[in-house]
């Protein structure tokens, strides 16, 4: 290998190319390897676990060309960019091979499956600003989806934070000037440490430059049709994205055919804290989609549908008309389960048409991509047959005008592409026999050459007398003759030895070399012609890019709507009814996720009625008290989720739900330290609370849990009451406010309702009923919950003593519930060990609604038999017998009175 000293021509070439791409890892092609040098080698070898070597003091590492895609994908997941530098001239001895970067791959510019996550969008976003307006735009090059919005400069900080949280781009393209003019942007970006940031030259955002790029991309001189506002940052934002992507992909973006303009107020505003607390797309435990709302709703069968479902969950609708359009389609499928079943089976045959079409347009599609497109077209064409039984809702199936074109494309791909074609185009074997007469002729020549090789082998067998003489082929030697060790003495002089093995030797001859050269020329001609035909087929498909993208979008929407219908059938959900009186009425509401992970029938449904109207007799503020573990947080979250699910356009987990669309959903439930930003739990809690008080409107839904818990009791109580009063008197939003500050129960207002989570106390046992009823709860039963958590009995006893002392100092007698707790500690021999928690949800409502037998049954259901001793079990049985005898006596007495 030539010297790698920095003054060699090769290294000068490397450094010159590297300087053009300072923010990317340069994959520098050297023969069958991509090499990395200097700082790239040091960094990548550590990141990917590659072997680091040195040549003439220069650090280097490399990966084979055939495994490079795997390593590039790993780098992208680490948030890196890769500049792919290829050899663009044939190597000539003594001359430096020409090289250039043919593509820049980054999380926001990737288009090939190896570099993408199925079901996830990977957007490239940008921000541009003028003195009065800020534009936010994002584009997914792998599908062609392109969006833009703008807002007044004064609203930029809040609006940008919401949009970055909602869109969650993979990469952001910014100019240095916008970072200077929007100092708040740096703080927003710091919230997303994994977001790849690319700094573009200010010239990239120049209005004239971007306008020309847009004219070229959309093939129009009139940009009004693109919904871009003249004399605004819109042009710079949209044009910069197009320009940057054309530079990185080294190809026109013919599949990007429209820009969707939206207004941020078209959708329900959900901030990052609320999105996290409601576990909409990922859970709080390990940040996966397990046990999330997304998992509960996701019965999609296509990658396109999965991405659209994520988008819809990030963008709940505010328009009743738009929500109703979706609901009408869900109702259609919900009421026709036989059609739904057939539709779901057909959708399972549809591949990722959006990304397939993008690769076709960017000339990156291979034979198997076109086969996947063919199978998808076949499935899409069968959708129309489902309409024979019942007309589908509009805009979900291919139009009658599109059908002939789709059939024509399907026919072209069916006739042309071989089912077993390879991924690599240079391997050939792409096109079916019979598609092209010229190609068939080349096949005939190649096949004849094979016959000639067979004839030559027969002649050599006869000439040498070696009946076991074989002809084989590999990439290293080409065609060769193989002679076993036992026949080497019969090898003639014109055999030229190529390789010796343990059991055979390999030879060639001048005649075989000539025949092989003829075969190679025929094969090269055939592969070259196949590639030309394939390129023609791909161009034909590309000419219908817009039609294919339109129908792919319809399929994605169809997939999500059928997913909603299937979820409703699976989970027993009902159709929400939208009203305009500002009310929220939920009957038998359930938590969509918690319910599914409990045994069937165990979740306790609850009702709720709220209104934001000033003149309504209905409450708009519900103050909720109840013990720990009683189900307050579940009730709070399920209310928010029911509203969100309804405004996405789905059925909801309730017997009945009537609601007026909300404009914002806030959910402040729990908090944690933000150590990286130097913020304590209480500061995080207060920051979230302040945001809600500033941003909530009368049309919002506010969920707040345990405000003020992170500081001293007096401070926390004061803050909780002040926040409650502000929400009630000034914000006037529909509010659920859960608290352990039972002193707040004295609050009164015509539109304030006190709700509590019921608790059943029987002798020495406490059962959390999970049922929401009017009234206030006098205790949090903290010591009882501490017992369930397994605190030592001595600690529990001491806690009861201290509780009594604290209450006596406060000048009040211990509450009845506190006495029960102390009594429970004192009677440890008569009570089972509460080390194992009761079932999280039990189907019980209130003590006065149950017979003694049912109450005992509830207590038995809450027991963990592995956690009680035989003596404790006998004690329990004795108590139950006494209770049953007492119950029988009461019933007998009641019967006697009635007869009398």
Swiss-Prot record:
Which segments does the entry list as coiled coil? none
One MF annotation (Gene Ontology) recorded for this entry: ATP-dependent DNA damage sensor activity
Q: Which UniProt keywords apply?
A: ATP-binding, DNA damage, DNA repair, DNA-binding, Nucleotide-binding
What SMART domains does the record tag this protein with? MUTSac (SM00534), MUTSd (SM00533)
Give any single GO term for biological process.
Answer: mismatch repair
GO CC field? cytosol
Q: Answer whether the UniProt record assigns the keyword DNA repair to this protein.
A: yes
Q: Identify the residues that bind ATP.
A: 626-633
HAMAP family assigned: MutS
Please state which protein family the record places this protein in.
Belongs to the DNA mismatch repair MutS family.
Entries under PANTHER family matching the protein: DNA MISMATCH REPAIR PROTEIN MSH1, MITOCHONDRIAL (PTHR11361:SF34), DNA MISMATCH REPAIR PROTEIN MUTS FAMILY MEMBER (PTHR11361)
* Function in brief: This protein is involved in the repair of mismatches in DNA. It is possible that it carries out the mismatch recognition step. This protein has a weak ATPase activity.
The name this protein carries in UniProt is DNA mismatch repair protein MutS
């Amino acid at each position: 290998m030539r010297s790698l000293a920095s003054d060699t021509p090769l290294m000068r070439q490397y450094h010159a190319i590297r300087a053009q791409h300072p923010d990317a890892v340069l994959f520098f092609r050297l023969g069958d390897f991509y090499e990395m040098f200097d700082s790239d080698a040091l960094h990548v070898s550590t990141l990917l676990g590659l072997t680091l070597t040195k040549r003439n003091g220069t650090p280097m590492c490399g990966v084979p060309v055939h495994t490079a895609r795997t390593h590039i994908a790993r780098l992208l997941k680490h948030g890196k960019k890769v500049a792919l530098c290829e050899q663009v001239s044939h190597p000539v001895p003594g001359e430096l091979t020409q090289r250039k970067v043919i593509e820049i791959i980054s999380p926001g510019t990737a288009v090939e499956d190896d570099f993408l996550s199925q079901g996830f969008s990977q957007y490239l976003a940008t921000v541009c600003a003028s003195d009065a307006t800020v534009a936010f735009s994002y584009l997914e090059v792998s599908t062609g989806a392109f969006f833009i919005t703008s807002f007044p400069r004064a609203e930029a900080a809040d609006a940008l934070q919401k949009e970055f949280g909602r869109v969650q781009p993979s990469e952001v393209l910014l100019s240095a000037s916008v970072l200077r003019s929007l100092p708040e942007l740096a703080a927003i970006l710091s919230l997303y440490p994994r977001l790849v940031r690319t700094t573009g030259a200010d010239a990239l955002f120049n209005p004239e430059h971007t306008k020309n790029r847009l004219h070229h991309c959309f093939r129009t001189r009139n940009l009004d049709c693109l919904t871009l506002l003249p004399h605004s940052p819109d042009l710079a934002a949209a044009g910069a994205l197009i320009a940057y992507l054309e530079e990185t992909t080294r190809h026109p973006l013919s599949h990007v055919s429209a820009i969707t303009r939206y207004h941020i107020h078209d959708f329900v505003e959900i901030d990052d804290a609320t999105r996290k607390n409601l576990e909409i797309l990922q859970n709080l435990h390990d940040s996966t989609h397990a046990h999330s709302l997304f998992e509960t709703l996701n019965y999609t069968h296509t990658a396109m549908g999965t991405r659209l479902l994520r988008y819809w969950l990030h963008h709940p609708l505010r328009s009743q008309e738009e929500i109703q359009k979706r609901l009408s389609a869900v109702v259609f499928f919900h009421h026709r389960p036989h059609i739904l079943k057939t539709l779901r089976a057909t959708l399972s045959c549809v591949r990722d048409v959006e990304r397939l079409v993008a690769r076709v347009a960017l000339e990156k599609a291979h034979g198997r991509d076109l086969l996947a497109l063919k199978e998808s077209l076949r499935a899409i064409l069968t959708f129309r047959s489902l309409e024979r039984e019942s007309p589908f809702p509009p805009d979900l199936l291919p139009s009658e005008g599109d059908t002939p074109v789709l059939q024509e494309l399907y026919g072209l791909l069916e006739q042309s592409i071989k089912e077993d074609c390879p991924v690599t185009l240079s391997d050939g074997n792409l096109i079916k026999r019979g598609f092209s007469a010229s190609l068939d002729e080349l096949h005939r020549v190649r096949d004849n050459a094979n016959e000639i090789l067979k004839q030559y082998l027969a002649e050599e067998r006869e000439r040498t007398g070696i009946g076991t003489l074989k002809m084989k082929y590999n990439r290293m030697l080409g065609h060769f003759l193989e002679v076993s060790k036992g026949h080497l003495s019969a090898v003639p002089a014109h055999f030229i030895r190529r390789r010796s093995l343990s059991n055979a030797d390999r030879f060639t001859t001048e005649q075989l070399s000539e025949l092989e050269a003829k075969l190679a020329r025929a094969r090269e001609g055939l592969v070259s012609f196949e590639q030309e035909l394939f390129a023609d087929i791909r161009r034909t498909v590309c000419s219908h890019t817009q039609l294919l993208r339109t129908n792919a979008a319809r399929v994605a929407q169809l997939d999500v709507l059928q997913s909603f219908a299937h979820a409703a059938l699976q989970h027993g959900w009902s159709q929400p009814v939208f009203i305009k009186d500002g009310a929220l009425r939920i009957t038998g509401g359930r938590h969509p996720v918690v319910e599914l992970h409990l045994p069937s029938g165990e979740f306790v449904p609850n009702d709720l009625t709220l209104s934001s109207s000033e003149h309504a007799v209905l409450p708009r503020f519900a103050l909720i008290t109840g013990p720990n573990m009683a189900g307050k947080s579940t009730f709070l979250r399920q209310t928010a989720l029911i509203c969100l699910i309804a405004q996405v356009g789905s059925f909801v987990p309730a017997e009945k739900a009537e609601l007026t669309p909300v404009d914002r959903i806030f959910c402040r439930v729990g908090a944690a330290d933000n150590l990286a930003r130097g913020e304590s739990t209480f500061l995080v809690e207060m920051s979230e609370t302040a945001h809600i008080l500033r941003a909530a409107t009368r049309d919002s839904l506010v969920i707040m849990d345990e405000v003020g818990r992170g500081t001293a009791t007096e401070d926390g109580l004061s803050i909780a009451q002040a926040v409650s009063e502000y929400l009630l008197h000034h914000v006037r939003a529909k509010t659920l406010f859960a608290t352990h500050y039972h002193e707040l129960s004295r609050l009164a207002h015509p539109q304030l309702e006190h709700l509590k989570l019921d608790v059943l106390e029987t002798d020495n046992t406490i059962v959390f009923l999970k049922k929401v009823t009017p009234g206030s709860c006098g205790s949090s039963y903290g010591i009882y919950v501490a017992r369930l958590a397994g605190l030592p009995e001595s600690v529990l006893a001491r806690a009861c003593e201290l509780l009594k002392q604290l209450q006596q100092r406060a000048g009040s007698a211990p509450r009845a519930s506190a006495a029960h707790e102390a009594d429970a500690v004192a009677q440890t021999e008569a009570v089972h060990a509460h080390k194992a928690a009761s079932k999280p949800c039990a189907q019980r409502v209130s003590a006065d609604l149950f017979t003694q037998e049912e109450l005992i049954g509830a207590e038995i259901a809450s027991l963990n038999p592995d956690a009680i001793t035989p003596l404790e079990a006998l004690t329990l049985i004795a108590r139950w017998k006494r209770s049953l005898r007492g119950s029988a006596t009461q019933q007998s007495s009641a019967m006697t009175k009635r007869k009398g």
